[in-house]
């Protein structure tokens, strides 16, 4: 989607009597339509003692409903030539389908049906606990650098359970989950007033008013329930450096992650976006600062990357969130040499800022990446829905390229100085010499 097309995208909002918020974004340039439900619950909202429950419940939502047996949801979407999925994030869980425009009502029925009454049974619960455990074994326990840095870094940088715990899931706590836990989680967090429905794409057959009528038809009779009060997850920024080492029996080389707190995007949006641009100036492309210094000039690392946001792109989580720099380095390179070089480059950027050409190059990279993502209805829909749920402004997803392009060198310099002036977390991953050195999550 071009900047002109994005600017012309109309956003229509409504709220049903049960509290469900609705966002409709027609796009006549595509033959498909996307339907998504964003629920305002993620890793940070799950109860202590039930680590991984938000992720587990995402799986349960695909196990049938009171109206449809297990796998029926899959068959209905695939028979329409569509795709579907779901994912759990720090502050939300999303579910979506993308289908030909003529299949819009089918997608609305499917999402409403499971939001009304998912099939919560002991069999489904036990089955999905096993599925999640196997997923964790595959992606974390038995994988080199598994959970690096998004699982391993937060407990070094943060102190509170919501921000520090492993949202993917803890085996022992998952195994203790009961059907009553699942029912309580659904009743509390999956209330209509705690969710947002987004419809984006080809709605020409119905028009906006027709889509709203279909939404009312399928979602309007879901009973209203109290909307949970969203707690603040704020906690103080560390006053000094924190450091921790973890063994990894599968890692061929040592690795390190440096974590910093970033500004709150709801109160300091430009400073937050300057940190996103700073990450690109540091590591995106062969000409980026840390690529030139750490990889090519000094040979201190074999790979380096930076990100503004622990799990996703810009504006994918509420405050607090994390700026990360990760690197893999040879065994004979001391971590403090890498840290010193990173600090040198941040100091230079804080003192002088990036050049105009450097900033222009990274702005172009951002614009290209965001436009490529926006070319797909699925990503555009999920971006609109997430920003509407988290910040009340889906428009933020459309404004990102222009707002990033408008950043000035002095704003990037300020972001670099802010990182140097704050406490940070340093996570060191050390290849374990023996499998027994690796802590098993089983």
Give the label of every model feature segment.
Residues 1-31:
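N- or domain-start disorder-to-order transition segments that initiate the globular core
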Residues 2-13, 154-195, 205-206, 210, ...:
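Histidine-acidic residue clusters that define the catalytic metal-binding segment
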Residues 2-4, 196-201, 349, 357-442:
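C-terminal regions of mature proteins
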Residues 19, 27-77, 153, 269-282, ...:
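Active/ligand-binding-proximal structured segments within catalytic/core domains
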Residues 39, 65-66, 70-185, 344, ...:
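Acidic/histidine-enriched segments that form metal/cofactor-coordinating
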Residues 133-152, 234-253, 296-307, 352-398, ...:
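Short acidic/His-enriched helical or mixed secondary-structure segments at domain edges of catalytic enzymes
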Residues 159, 163, 167, 191-192, ...:
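An aromatic/glycine/proline-enriched structural segment found at the starts
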Residues 257-261, 283-328:
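A structural supersecondary motif
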């Amino acid at each position: 989607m071009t900047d002109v097309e994005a600017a012309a995208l109309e956003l229509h909002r409504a709220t049903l009597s049960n509290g469900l918020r609705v966002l409709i974004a027609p796009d006549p340039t595509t033959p498909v339509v996307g339907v998504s439900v964003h629920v305002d619950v993620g890793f940070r909202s799950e109860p202590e003692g039930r680590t991984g429950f938000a992720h587990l419940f995402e799986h349960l939502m695909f196990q049938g409903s009171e109206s449809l047996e297990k796998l029926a949801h899959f068959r209905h979407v695939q028979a329409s030539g569509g795709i579907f999925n779901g994912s759990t994030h720090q502050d939300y869980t999303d579910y979506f389908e993308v289908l030909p425009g003529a299949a819009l009502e089918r997608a609305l029925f499917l999402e409403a049906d499971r939001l009304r009454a998912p099939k919560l049974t002991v069999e489904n619960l036990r089955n999905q606990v096993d599925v999640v455990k196997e997923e964790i074994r595959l992606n974390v326990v038995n994988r080199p650098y598994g959970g690096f840095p998004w699982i391993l870094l937060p407990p070094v940088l943060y102190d509170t359970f919501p921000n520090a715990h492993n949202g993917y899931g803890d085996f022992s706590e998952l195994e203790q989950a009961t059907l009553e836990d699942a029912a309580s989680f659904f009743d509390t967090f999956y209330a209509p007033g705690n969710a947002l429905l987004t419809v984006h794409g080809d709605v020409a057959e119905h028009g906006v008013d027709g889509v709203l009528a279909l939404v009312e038809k399928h979602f309007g009779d879901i009973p209203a329930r109290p909307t949970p009060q969203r707690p603040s997850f704020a906690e103080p920024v560390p006053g000094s450096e924190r450091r921790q080492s973890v063994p990894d029996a599968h890692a061929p080389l040592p690795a390190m992650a440096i974590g910093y707190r970033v500004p709150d995007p709801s109160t300091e949006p430009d400073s937050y976006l300057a940190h996103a641009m700073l990450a690109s100036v540091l590591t995106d492309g062969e000409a980026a600062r840390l690529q030139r210094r750490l990889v090519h000039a000094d040979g201190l690392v074999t790979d380096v990357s930076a990100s503004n946001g622990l799990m996703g792109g810009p504006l994918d989580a509420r405050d607090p969130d994390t700026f990360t720099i990760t690197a893999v380095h040879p065994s004979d390179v001391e971590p403090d040499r890498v840290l010193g070089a990173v600090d040198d480059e941040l100091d230079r950027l804080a003192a002088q800022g990036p050049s105009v050409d450097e900033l222009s190059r990274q702005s172009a990279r951002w614009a290209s990446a965001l436009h490529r993502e926006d070319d797909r209805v699925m990503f555009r829909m999920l971006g609109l829905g997430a920003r509407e749920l988290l910040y009340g402004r889906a428009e933020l997803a459309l404004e990102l390229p222009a707002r990033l392009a408008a950043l000035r060198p002095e704003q990037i310099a300020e972001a670099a100085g802010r990182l140097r002036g704050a406490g940070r977390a340093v996570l060191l991953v050390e290849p374990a010499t023996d499998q027994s050195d690796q802590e098993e999550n089983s």
